[in-house]
Amino acid sequence: MQFQNPEKQQPRISETAWISETAIIIGDVTIGENVYVAHNAVIRADEPGSSIVIGDNCNVQDNVIIHGLSNSKVSVGNNTSLAHGCIVHGPCVLGEGCFVGFGAVVFDCTIGKDNLILHNATVRKVDIPDGKVVPDGAIITEQKDVAQLADLSPEDSDFKKSVIAVNLHLVEGYTNLSKEV
């Protein structure tokens, strides 16, 4: 379902995106090409001056919440996966090719390209450079913690690419099903 926010801003969604009927998208939200937004995802740019931009070929899986504080922006780079039940809260920038795992929380930070934030991790008030791995359950809230992060491995990169491929397949499949109805 799509709603305008109190400032009367409407979501702008690419015609090639697939949005579940149970997803809720509110306000100044831009969704790019071939994006998959799964069941019960909530994407809210309803606080004054907040905006959310989701790049091309992204997936926003079941029960994900994306929200921005007043006068903040959430930017999700192309080819990024937001896995089941994670929270991305603005102000926040996620670079291209990132993966945010199940139940992870990302708030008030800048995440570079090709990062893997694993399940139930918390990342807050830090800048993470390109190509790092935040381990399962890690709490990264000080810049000094970032120096301890491992580099992305080829296996990690392959995993991220496989998630994107599966979700692009879902966009195509669900789009084709909706044309049959």
Question: Residues of each region from the PLM?
Answer:
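Conserved SET/PR domain catalytic loop and adjacent active-site segment
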Residues: 39-40, 131
